[in-house]
Amino acid sequence: MNRFFVDRPVFAAVISIVLVLAGLICIRILPVAQYPELTPPQVVVSATYPGASAETVAQTVAAPLEQQINGVENMLYMQSSSLGSGTMQLTVTFALGTDPDQATINVNNRVQRATSSLPQEVQRLGVTVDKRFTTILGMVAMFATTDRYDRTYVGNYALLNVVDDLKRLPGVGDVQLLGNIDYSMRVWLRPDKLAQYNLTPSDVSAAIQEQNAQFAAGRFGDQPDPHAGPFTYTATTQGRLPDAAAFENIILRSSSQNAATLRLKDVARVELGTESYLVDSNLNGTPAVPIAIYLQPGANALNTMELIQNRMNELKASFPAGIDYAIPFDTTKFIKVSIEEVVHTFIEAIILVVLVVFIFLQNWRATLIPVIAVPISIIGTFAGMYVLGFSINLLTLFGLVLAIGIVVDDAIVVLENVERIMTTEKLSPRKAAIKAMGEVTGPVIAIVLVLCAVFIPVAFMGGLVGEMYKQFAVTIAISVTLSGLVALTLTPALCALILKPGHHEPILPFRIFNRAFERVTSGYTRGVRFFLKRATIGLIIFAGLLGSTYYLFERVPGSLLPDEDQGFLFGVAVLPPAASLERTTVVLDQVSENIRKNPAVDNVFAVSGFDLLSGGLKTSAGTMFIMLKDWKERTTPDADARNLPRTIMGMNAGIKDGMVLAFNPPPIMGLSTTGGFELYVQDRTGGGVESLTQATKLITEAAAKRPELQGVRTTFDPNVPQYDIQLDREKAKAMGVPINSVFTAMQATFGSLYVNDFTLYGRNYQVNLQSEAEFRRDPGDLKHVFVRADSGSMIPLDALVTVKRIVGPDQLERFNAFNAAKVTGNPAPGYTSGDAIKAMQEVAAQVLPQGYQIAWTGSAYQEVSTSGTGSQAMIFGLIMVFLILAAQYERWSLPLAVITAVPFAIFGALLATDLRGLTNDVYFQIGLVTLIGLAAKNAILIVEFAVLERESGKSAIEAAASAARLRFRPIVMTSLAFILGVVPLAVSTGAGSASRHSIGTGVIGGMLAATFIATFFIPMFYSLIARKPPKKHEDETADTPETPGGTGGGI
């Protein structure tokens, strides 16, 4: 085998060409995204109970649904939100990896069990079950450029002509028009006119149901008919009414005596309006309709957004004059720029690696070999990624950047050995290649096995962190495997073809470098011999290093992922409870105008009536999507998205009618609402709103005193002004008034009463009753609303009910079937999410009363549930390295000499991270896993050659010293190539730089320690372990000696 590929260079070349072709083909078809699917699947159950209070919705709608859904397969947690507008949304979150379609089916089956226990009105309107697409791709804004079209027309034009079209595009998961502005036939009742004609809202509702209905009229001449004619005719008749004019003419009462007819237009105003008037929105001050677009799981984000842009341009050609669109919110800009930055880093890494190799080899022919070999392994990796269903994302690209410095090792190990044999033994390139392969085949295979043993088992870890590990680790494992294949096939063939016998005197700069490196090598050798002779001192230093490593592990703060400048921010304006939508719109317009004055801001999309923090519709809150200018235009620290929130809140601090909050989005969109933490304070005692309020107040006030925390607040507000209406049921019964007629009249007057549907443009829309605005402004208007007693007399509502002003919540949330209050917050400057989580846990343990506890959600849930995962991955990697080496060496003790290199790498990584003020996040932990393999690789090169020297008859100390001196240059060369290949990650700027800094800093620090510190100690540990000569097997003969790794000196 040693000479097979040396003698067959075409065969070796064909293998590499196939790898490159497969990789190039797969690059074109692999999906591109910022991250793989890291957000847990969610299923949303929605229901509406028009006119009901938040408490009523929670008790009669949310609770029965939760009781049935609780415990559905693979469920992590569920959360419901019941609003004073009568809407309820229940979100069920499932474990990562759950099939969202199957989860939707399972939830829907549970919902069907609960349907019969829901209020009749809720059943009529229907309960919807949908899977939620958590990855928002962007937002399209449609607006009128003239006064000809109002927001209702623009929104419904978008619904009919844009939304459905975009939904059909490949890669689009869902398209939602925010604000629920579907057409609705609005019947605006005048209670004074109803009273004048002795009518009630129920009479109007019954008349509409009777006359706006679809009827089947049958067929003439249909079978069976023994005297059937030659034709069969279908009979048609007017069914649903087509427009507002037809609804106006609905007959409410008709008299045969005087031919008088009372029509709907006599007691109400009818118009084509919208289903809801709870939301208003504008783009940079211009009224606009927001259309949110969500990405389908596994789809190519960049291609999908390009399809959307192209399709919108095509649709624009048919827009009515005066209607236009913009795409102010586009998350793919960050994806595109951050991936471009990683690609630039990738190219810089290749250049630096080639430069290091050339400096050490000092021969352009020799340098050409790894230059050819490295791209083959990297490009071929894309084929492996495609087979495994991976995408081109930040994690896989990080893996490829680190892989550059790793895969070059195998080529250099072979090349350096061939050159050494050519120089010392004066052999031809072909013979040197054959002999070199006999010596390095074992180490190359061992390195590949060890690196794969580190990375592949990590891929089987579960959860969000496990998925991130898998993307990264498997990418490197594929590249390392292909690198080993190329090193054993193409590299020796290239050595035999490209290298030339005889070496000329190197040029002056190289001679200076060589002399300097020889002095370094001599100093290194003296240091190695010092520790070989004084092992006690070495062991004491090693023990101190272990203690320092433990201290740094405790000192470096933990977090899930670093905050990034993603090119946009979220803003929220919160007004006093019960503030009207008009007040909110005025404040939001003022805030938006202020924000647009900041030179770093590009667009502001403001949505009044939507509270991003609570996820519900509130007239007293508004949300802003703030798009920033390109990263190249924002080079100063104050223009960084991570620093802008403080600036934005400061410039709006003078607004007296509301509080303005701004925050950077979470690192992974869809995992949580904000970039901070989210939790729920659960009431497990059933104590009611007041008890929950007190418990929430205790925890927020205590959290405000902790230095690790800032901005801790609750979305739970129990002090929203309300009216409590009490019906005197005994009086109503005594007067012969049905109880249900009282509440139907109130709903149709002060709320919105859904009657039935009508058809327009091929779609079905709701018909809704509600009083004109002048009759529903305050409780005094109750005197204008009448109900009919059994005797036929008309009774005003104010004679049956009493009204009292109270305060209460307009939104009630439940978490895992318990009443709960949502609390959000952020780490204070200088602290991490891990610090904040720990502080909140301590606060909760100290102040929450018996029966109350906190439950994490979003990114905080993932961080808490994956705590310790990094340590598990590292320990698992160490165990696998040990077992692989034990199998290779056929000894349990010798692998310990290799394992001892790992603590040095961990120490260096932690020290570098601590000095730079970074955190122990997932990227850092991924880097640690990489360092285990790389540190072990360096140790393997020393131990392998020490084993060969030991078998040649040298003592353990001499074998260790000789191996250290012999392998120092290739170790330094490969390690420097790797380190310089990672430097662009650690010093990068722009989009996605925080994650690149996190992984680059730790890896560089670890490799520096593994290269320039651990190499002094590895020979010492080998000598301590190998002092006893290896035992000979009984069946070994003198003429067939075997190395521990088999033939050729393998490990």
From Swiss-Prot:
Any one GO MF annotation of this record: efflux transmembrane transporter activity
Coiled-coil residue windows: none
Membrane topology: Multi-pass membrane protein
Phenotype seen when the gene is deleted: Shows increased sensitivity to deoxycholate, ethidium bromide and crystal violet.
Induction: Repressed by BepR.
One cellular component term from this protein's GO annotations in UniProt: plasma membrane
Keyword DNA repair assigned: no
Record flagged with keyword Disulfide bond: no
Bilayer-crossing regions: 10-30, 341-361, 366-386, 387-407, 444-464, 478-498, 537-557, 867-887, 892-912, 928-948, 971-991, 1002-1022
SUPFAM superfamilies (alphabetical): Multidrug efflux transporter AcrB pore domain, PN1, PN2, PC1 and PC2 subdomains, Multidrug efflux transporter AcrB TolC docking domain, DN and DC subdomains, Multidrug efflux transporter AcrB transmembrane domain
Region (Disordered): 1032-1051
Compartments, as annotated in UniProt: Cell inner membrane
One annotated GO biological process: response to antibiotic
Keywords in alphabetical order: Antibiotic resistance, Cell inner membrane, Cell membrane, Membrane, Transmembrane, Transmembrane helix, Transport
Function: Involved in resistance to several unrelated toxic compounds, such as dyes, detergents and antibiotics.
Subunit structure: Probably part of a tripartite efflux pump, which is composed of an outer membrane efflux protein, an inner membrane protein and a protein that expands the periplasmic space. Could form a tripartite pump with BepC and BepD.
Assigned protein family: Belongs to the resistance-nodulation-cell division (RND) (TC 2.A.6) family.
Entry protein name: Efflux pump membrane transporter BepE
Species the sequence originates in: Brucella suis biovar 1 (strain 1330)
Native organism taxonomy: Bacteria, Pseudomonadati, Pseudomonadota, Alphaproteobacteria, Hyphomicrobiales
